[in-house]
Amino acid sequence: MATIQYYGTGRRKEAVARVRLMPGKGNIIINNKSLEEYFPLETLRYTVKQPLILTETIDKFDVYVKVSGGGLSGQAGAIRHGIARALVKADAELRPILKKAGFLTRDPRMKERRKYGLKKARKAPQFSKR
């Protein structure tokens, strides 16, 4: 018997998360690890759960995620974006709630490139007057 699945792709910085929602008890599995195992910081765990908490669907879906690229913070943001998109596919009535909270918007902020003549993107080498 095929179970109902909802997919959503989330992106943030260099991270890409492929999220799969299935009706269940609220388990969150990221790259075959539990949420607590994958994200050691409570703030990152909360970031991942935000769309589910806001829509009160935390105990209605099991979330399976494959995430790659970026660091932990970017990955958490990508997962949040992916979960929000999958929730909208599951129930279109949740769209205004998630949109108002800003979870459906792809955060466009990226790392600024380094320019020649500078140490980093904007940091100049030390200036010597004499």
UniProtKB/Swiss-Prot annotation:
GO terms for cellular component: cytosolic small ribosomal subunit. Pfam families: Ribosomal_S9. One of its GO terms (biological process) is translation. It comes from the Bacteria. Residues 109-130 are annotated as: Disordered. Keywords: Ribonucleoprotein, Ribosomal protein. One of its GO terms (molecular function) is RNA binding. The keyword Ribosomal protein applies. Residues 111-130 have a biased composition (Basic residues). HAMAP family: Ribosomal_uS9_B. NCBIfam families: PRK00132.1 (NF001099). Belongs to the universal ribosomal protein uS9 family. This is Small ribosomal subunit protein uS9. It comes from Caldanaerobacter subterraneus subsp. tengcongensis (strain DSM 15242 / JCM 11007 / NBRC 100824 / MB4). The gene is rpsI.
